[in-house]
A protein has these predicted regions:
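Soluble or luminal CAZymes and related metallo-dependent hydrolases
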Residues: 32, 76, 128-132, 154, ...
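Mobile, glycine- and charge-enriched loop segments
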Residues: 44-51, 109-123, 148, 152-155
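Glycine-rich adenosyl-binding loop in Rossmann-like folds that engage adenosine-containing cofactors
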Residues: 5-38, 96-142
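Conserved acidic-Pro-Pro-aromatic motif
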Residues: 48, 67-73, 138-216
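S-adenosyl-L-methionine
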Residues: 1-87, 91, 141, 188-191, ...
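Short, charged, surface-exposed secondary-structure boundary motifs
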Residues: 80-83, 105-107, 182-186
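Short, glycine/acidic-enriched loop or turn micro-motifs at the edges of active sites
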Residues: 55-57, 78, 100-102, 151-155, ...
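Hydrophobic packing residues within well-ordered alpha-helices of enzyme cores
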Residues: 64, 84, 109, 158-162
Length: 216
C-alpha cells in the first residue's frame, strides 16, 4: 500500500514520517521524551534485551538499538509500521507488525485518542478487525532486561500476556500510565495493585506519564 509520507530530519537522521502527522512528531522529538530510553536504560543493570511497544515510527527503537544488544519492537498500525520499517535498519532490532495483549485475536485500531487527524501516535485497540494481536508469552524471546510498553491504555492486557516472561526474567518495567486505560475498563490504580500483588513489583520512579516498576 502506498502511504503519504515525508522526510523529516532530527538528531542528524532523516526520518520517513506520515505526511499528515504533526502532534506525535512534536511530542516525540521533545528532548525529555526523546531521551526517555536513555533515562530508563540508566536504571537497567544488564543491557542485553529490551522489549518495546508501541514502536510508532521508530524513534524509541532507534535509540534503544544503541543502548541494548537486541531490541524487540512492536507496532500494529500499518502506516506507522511502514515508517518504522523504513527508519530502522539496524541488525539488532527485530521489528514486529503486531499488537500485544493477553491472548491471540484479530483486532482493529480506533482513531487517535486526541481525535485529531494530524496525530498518528494515539491509536488504540477498538474491537475486532484484521490486525493480529498476540501475547508476549507466545513468542520465543530468549531474555528480557527491560519491558517498555506505551499502548494507549492497553498496557494491562499486554502485561497479563507476558506473566511467564516477566516471572522468568524479572525485567525492569516501564509503562505509560494515564486515564486512557479507563476506555478499556480499568484504572491505573487497579493495574498497579495487580502489579504489586501478582507480579511482586514496586514503583521506583515516575516521569510525567511514564511509571517505572522494579522487582521486589
Amino acid at each position: 500500500m502506498n502511504y503519504k509520507t515525508s522526510i523529516r530530519n532530527f538528531d542528524n537522521k532523516d526520518w520517513v514520517w506520515p505526511e499528515r502527522d504533526i502532534v506525535a512528531w512534536r511530542y516525540l522529538t521533545r528532548e525529555d521524551h526523546y531521551n526517555l530510553p536513555i533515562n530508563v536504560s540508566n536504571l537497567v543493570k544488564n543491557r542485553n534485551i529490551v522489549v518495546q511497544a508501541g514502536g510508532h515510527c521508530g524513534l524509541y527503537p532507534n535509540k534503544y538499538a544503541s543502548l541494548f544488544k537486541k531490541v524487540y519492537t512492536f507496532e500494529p498500525h500499518p502506516e506507522n509500521f511502514y515508517c518504522l520499517d523504513q527508519n530502522i535498519q539496524q541488525d539488532n532490532v527485530v521489528k514486529n507488525n503486531l499488537a500485544l495483549g493477553e491472548k491471540e485475536s484479530m483486532i482493529s485500531l480506533g482513531e487517535p485518542l486526541t481525535k485529531k487527524k494530524n496525530n498518528t501516535g494515539g491509536y488504540t485497540v477498538s474491537g475486532k478487525g484484521n490486525i493480529k494481536l498476540i501475547s508476549l508469552d507466545s513468542l520465543d524471546i530468549e531474555g528480557c532486561d527491560l519491558l517498555h510498553l506505551d499502548l494507549e491504555g492497553f498496557e494491562w492486557f499486554a502485561l497479563k500476556g507476558a506473566v511467564n516472561l516477566i516471572n522468568k526474567y524479572r525485567p525492569l518495567i516501564v509503562l505509560e500510565t494515564n486515564d486512557y486505560c479507563e476506555m478499556h475498563g480499568y484504572t491505573v490504580v487497579e493495574m498497579e495493585q495487580w502489579i504489586v500483588s501478582e507480579l511482586k513489583y514496586k514503583i521506583i520512579d515516575k516521569w510525567e506519564h511514564d511509571t517505572v516498576y522494579a522487582p521486589e
